[in-house]
């Protein structure tokens, strides 16, 4: 179970009350202590937070609940991380701080820069992932992406070149989402990504302060990520580089990382996962991205994610999505 600081619930009680609900009741039924609604520093289950957001959205008939929560939160909730982000030189530097130190506030969440999932060379992507083997819920995704969007506008001092927002699910309220992001919002995608025109490094921040950035960075450097979590990311990176080009085996990755295979197995187990789970999660992610974002033949998609035969890939697709790769692609095109 991944933990998250209760700052992620900031504004929950007030918003639920405005909508005519009982925040304490929803919290308890979702597995959260009511004290978490009054503090920004408690560690609570991220799964329970996700349940609370979905419950509130459903019971209060508020499909854009996550976006409304995002409007009530700002970078000050992130402490030293917020300071480092705010006083960075560019959006690229700010995003690196988030990628490296978001674990201080949310163990499982990952946000990082990626190439454009639709393949445009002049577009950058900022991707949100709930972690290996975890599927982000619509309201949690809205809260994270909504927060990131508002922060980017504040940091840059205006529009930052948002091209589109890609979601792994249909937007619960298309009009509200389009109005919030001031751009196209599309569902049925491989992952949650904000697409941005141009280079993130070229987007300079209006409150850049080298000394404050250095001091905030020094405070963040005192925090140490769980070594096992680092191993998961290292394995994922090694597999990404080898996928479709080299054997995707525990032994091959262990050799690349200069550790014994059994040691690597133990480290992954201590992170609550396994080599097979990390590989399967990466294959699923990459396969959906290729199906949705390209027109590569199915056999070539299979090869790109490490399957020698399209039939094997198709069987695995049924396990992931309950349907065939072609139907995944067709469904995305219709969305």
Predicted regions and their residues:
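Short acidic/histidine-centered micro-motifs embedded in hydrophobic/aromatic stretches
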Residues: 29-33, 168, 281
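Extended mid-to-C-terminal alpha-helical interaction segments
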Residues: 170-335
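Conserved active-site and cofactor/substrate-binding residues in soluble primary-metabolism enzymes
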Residues: 7, 21, 143, 230, ...
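N-terminal low-complexity or simple alpha-helical regulatory segments
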Residues: 1-123
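Hydrophobic alpha-helical core bundles mediating ligand binding, dimerization, or RNAP-core interactions
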Residues: 53, 145-148, 220, 239
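N-terminal regulatory/effector-sensing and dimerization cores
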Residues: 76-200
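Short amphipathic alpha-helical face segments that pack within enzyme cores
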Residues: 11, 143-147, 286
């Amino acid at each position: 179970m991944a933990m998250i600081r209760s700052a992620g619930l900031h504004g929950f009680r007030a918003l639920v009350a405005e909508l005519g609900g009982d925040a304490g009741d929803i919290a308890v039924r979702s597995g959260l202590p009511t004290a978490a609604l009054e503090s920004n520093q408690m560690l609570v289950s991220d799964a329970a937070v996700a349940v609370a957001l979905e419950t509130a959205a459903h019971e209060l008939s508020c499909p854009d609940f996550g976006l409304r929560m995002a409007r009530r939160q700002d970078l000050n909730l992130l402490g030293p991380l917020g300071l480092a982000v705010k006083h960075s030189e560019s959006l690229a530097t700010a995003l690196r701080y988030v990628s490296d130190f978001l674990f201080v506030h949310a163990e499982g969440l990952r946000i990082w820069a990626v190439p454009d999932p639709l393949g445009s060379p002049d577009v950058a992507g900022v991707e949100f992932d709930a972690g290996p083997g975890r599927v982000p819920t619509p309201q949690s995704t809205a809260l994270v992406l909504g927060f990131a969007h508002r922060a980017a506008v504040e940091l840059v001092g205006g529009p930052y070149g948002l091209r589109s927002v890609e979601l792994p699910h249909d937007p619960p309220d298309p009009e509200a989402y389009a109005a919030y992001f001031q751009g196209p919002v599309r569902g049925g995608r491989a992952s949650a990504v904000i697409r941005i025109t141009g280079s993130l490094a070229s987007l300079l921040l209006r409150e850049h302060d080298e000394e404050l950035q250095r001091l905030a960075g020094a405070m963040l450097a005192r925090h140490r990520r769980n070594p096992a979590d680092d191993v998961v990311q290292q394995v994922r990176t090694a597999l990404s580089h080898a996928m479709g080009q080299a054997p995707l085996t525990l032994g091959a990755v262990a050799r690349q990382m200069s550790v014994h295979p059994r040691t690597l197995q133990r480290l992954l187990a201590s992170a609550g996962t396994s080599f097979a789970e990390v590989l399967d999660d990466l294959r699923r992610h990459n396969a959906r991205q290729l199906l949705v974002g390209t027109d590569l033949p199915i056999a070539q998609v299979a090869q790109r994610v490490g399957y020698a035969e399209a039939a094997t890939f198709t069987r695995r697709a049924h396990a992931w999505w309950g349907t065939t790769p072609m139907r995944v692609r067709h469904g995305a095109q219709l969305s």
